[in-house]
Amino acid sequence: MFDITPIRVFGTSSIGVFIATNNTVTFIPPDVPEKIDDAVRNTLRTSVARFTVARSPLLGIFTVVNDNGVLLPPLVLEEEVRLFKALGLNVDIINTKYTAISNLILAGNKVALVSPLLEPSARKVVADVLGVEVIVDTIAGNPLVGALAVLNSRGLLVAPEATDDDLKKLSEYFKVRVDVGTVNRGKSFLRGGIVVNDNGALVGDETAGPELMRMQQVLG
């Protein structure tokens, strides 16, 4: 059963900037309420790790996570890296001038779509740490590929700006069903409002009924 639970974090429906997940662990900021732990455990069905990156709660922006590993930006602190490594995942710092790395990488467990903005040396780290084939491309000509889509092992939901050609390419890259959708009443930057794994999705609480139905169809 694929559950979808609407939540707010720090008073905003942009929950994806604060939370990152795979199928084993979900990373949340230290000072979110306990009810978010409950939502994670009941919906995503993972353990919970309360971490920061550069002492910031923006885990969804500053990390890229799949079942194989975790990528962190250069501004992460050494003691924070140690905490991530203690979970037994592959962990490395991606050497790039960009800090909001999740905007530039759309990562599954076998393939990652990477923005052409990301330096070639950084792309190799993506491949090694996440254990994926790296494909460099845009979505609708936009290099912020990680912000415009979310995926799990069943489906990929992408912003409505994506063309038919984009949908076809994404389906070929990731070998899952692909369709367009929005979150939080029409927002195209899906990563900002959706945290998804194979078990379920947490979404911003402004998400409308038709948006929830589309998520269930594509990701469930």
From Swiss-Prot:
Gene responsible for this protein: eif6
Record's keyword annotation contains Cell wall biogenesis/degradation: no
SMART domains associated with the record: eIF6
Family, as annotated: Belongs to the eIF-6 family.
GO terms under cellular component: cytosol
Extent of the signal sequence: none
SUPFAM superfamilies, per the entry: Pentein
Family matches, as Pfam families: eIF-6
HAMAP family cross-referenced by the UniProt entry: eIF_6
UniProt name for this protein: Translation initiation factor 6
Organism for this UniProt entry: Pyrobaculum aerophilum (strain ATCC 51768 / DSM 7523 / JCM 9630 / CIP 104966 / NBRC 100827 / IM2)
